[in-house]
Amino acid sequence: MAGAAVHARGLRKAYGQRVAVDGIDLEVRRGECFGFLGPNGAGKTTTMRMLACLSSRDAGELAVLGMDPDSQPRELKARLGVVPQEINLDLELTVLENMLVYARYFGMRRDDARARALELLRFVDLHERADDTVMKLSGGMQRRLQIARALINEPEMILLDEPTTGLDPQARRLVWERLRDLRAGGTSVVITTHYMDEAERLCDRLVVIDHGVVICQGQPAALVRDRVGAEVLEMRAAPDQAAVLAAAASPRNLVEGDVVMAFGDSAHDMRVRADAAGIAWDLVAERRATLEDLFIVLTGHSLRESSAGGD
């Protein structure tokens, strides 16, 4: 697609015998927030490393901002902002010093770098902590400083790997707010996440990835509506009757021991069909369908169950 922020076809990366990314196709449009949703070990971080010129691909096509990360890393890095999952700040330097040191990598004049740094610290609500050492900041503040630092070169696109992992709810919301501000200003934003609420709140479009393969992509709400339905009915029944109850309630279902999850457009209709099956059951929950349910329908297991291991 002409003018895409990211264009990938058949993208593949392996580490020895382990295939981390297995021939994925994707397009990221300029100015959108695009997400990679999946469990730990799905291939999200490996894909981001290829986009960020930190790891070469084994096969396939990849263009980021119209450039090949493998053959044009210097030019591309000048136009990218990258926020890794781990905190990689200089803890003994002040907040402002961290910004100024990073600006040197882009050849910025000191006066320009200082002005830009102070502007960004205000953007992430850290201007009053400019002279504090980083070790005095909370985890959420350190994450916001990482975002500010990644913006020092006024990038066209920013890549964030699990940007809110380990943060408390208030800190997560502050990060989300700043990412929405960036998107509103025209910056392309690409994130990886295993948090369903984060993907639903931030992403214009996303891919669901598992075991290095893209299993679906599109707008979050549309994916849930088309693949899952509007509502979920969770029931409990005798283990030897749970499968029969599930099939009666909806053709889209999951059985885990004595717990049945039925997916469809109407929880009321699913309850009627469950009652008609003549099997005793208890209601566990009746709720709106989410991206977690989408993942369950597509893979047969939850994101939480899949989250052991690295990426």
Features from the language model and the residues they span:
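Conserved ABC ATPase "signature" region
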Residues: 100, 104, 111-129
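Conserved ABC ATPase signature
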Residues: 133-137
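Conserved catalytic motifs of ABC-family nucleotide-binding domains
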Residues: 154
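Catalytic Walker B motif of ABC-type/P-loop ATPase nucleotide-binding domains
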Residues: 158-161
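ABC transporter nucleotide-binding domain
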Residues: 176-265
